[in-house]
Amino acid sequence: MNILIINAGSSSLKYQLMDPDTGVVSAKGLCERIGIDGRLNHKVGDNKVVKDIPMPTHSEAIATTLEILQDAEHGVIKSVDEIDAVGHRVLHGGMEFFDSCIINDEVIKAIEKCIPLGPLHNPANLMGIRACQAVMPTTPQVAVFDTAFHMTMPPKAYRYAIPTEYYENDSIRRYGFHGTSHKYVARRTAELVGKKEFKMVNCHLDNGSSMSAVKDGKCQDTTMGLTPLAGVPMGTRSGDIDPAVVQFICNKYGMNVDECLNMLNKKSGMLALSGVSSDFRDLEDGAKNGNEDCALAREKFCYEVAKFVGAYAAALNGIDVLTFTAGVGENDGAVRARVCEYLGFLGVKIDPELNSKRGKEMLISTPDSKVQVWVVPTNEELMIAQDTAELVNAAK
């Protein structure tokens, strides 16, 4: 089975052609600078192709994608008919979507309804969907929402303590993001530990970071909120702060709210604390060379991650498994070690030698650790492909 996975941004479109059963990616690429001058980056195995191709809209980007996939020299299929379905990443499903779903007119209207909650991403996601529908009208299309996995949270976790009319009229609540990654890691961890009923905290740590408390495969709480700005401090995002900071800064420095939020989203986090970089590798190098601000940034990050693990351990009444995933979670052993050092009170113990390895799926806790600690490389594209295949096969 061939699933085409589409992740449409405002001026870009990422794609992968994948077998959902084996996880084998036959081709992948990126259409970038859509609406400007257009460039295609295409990869099959170790072979890379870069072409400058005009792409005024996402429709041309989809057409370019399908052409290169069928290309005699660089393609992997002979006909579009070999694509069984298309899975689209959609950022925000709001309160409309609790799971992935086959796209029809009603689904598109509901995604449009969620645009106020995802004003940057949802319109781009819709452009990708409509472009695919135009070029592949008979091929099933599936929407996979970044927020859906977190929709099993109870009201005590997702409601904000603000007047009810903002929830009832404007759907203001905690939604959470990186849901496809959290879902994949939760499923994969269940396979690794050999059971479905257990309590876990997953740490998706990267330039954008989020954590989730999961019980028996269902999300109970997560760190991001109405937007991805909430939770732990990130590469350039502040994470949780006193909301009154916004008013204080706006009043003192003459900023408007949009300018202040731009600062909190793009000029804060590790970049602000270190004064050097948002990249954890740069911070590690800086700390080793005696830069105290770089050391503080990394320590602040580990401290906040550990705090949320502790909070979620309380919310779940204990945890059985702690998982690390995404760029920093999979590759930065020093961050994992420091987080786990904070969690000694939970009986967390890790093997330093195992923890020193990068990017590999493995158990890094010791046999006498009271909590299993795993590194589980995420695979959001595979999760999208599997969700898409399950829905399409069920509809036959």
Residue ranges and their predicted role:
Residues I3, S12-M55, G225:
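Short glycine-rich, Thr/Ser-proximal phosphate-binding strand/loop in the N-terminal lobe
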Residues A8-G9, H88-L91, L205-N207, T323-N331:
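Glycine-rich beta-strand-to-loop/alpha-helix junction loops that act as flexible
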Residues I68-I83, T189-G194, V309-D320:
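Phosphate/pyrophosphate-binding loops at sites that engage ATP/ADP/AMP, CoA/4′-phosphopantetheine
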Residues L69, E73-H121, V142, F149-R159:
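Short beta-strand-loop/turn "lid" adjacent to the catalytic site in phosphate-handling enzymes
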Residues F149-K252:
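Glycine-rich phosphate-binding loop of actin/hexokinase-like ATP-binding domains
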Residues K215, D221-N256, N262, A326-K357:
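Catalytic phosphate/nucleotide-handling subdomain of diverse soluble enzymes
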Residues N262, G269-L273, F280-A315:
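Adenine-nucleotide phosphate-binding core of ATP-dependent small-molecule kinases
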Residues A295, E299-N317, G329-K396:
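Internal helix-turn-beta structural module
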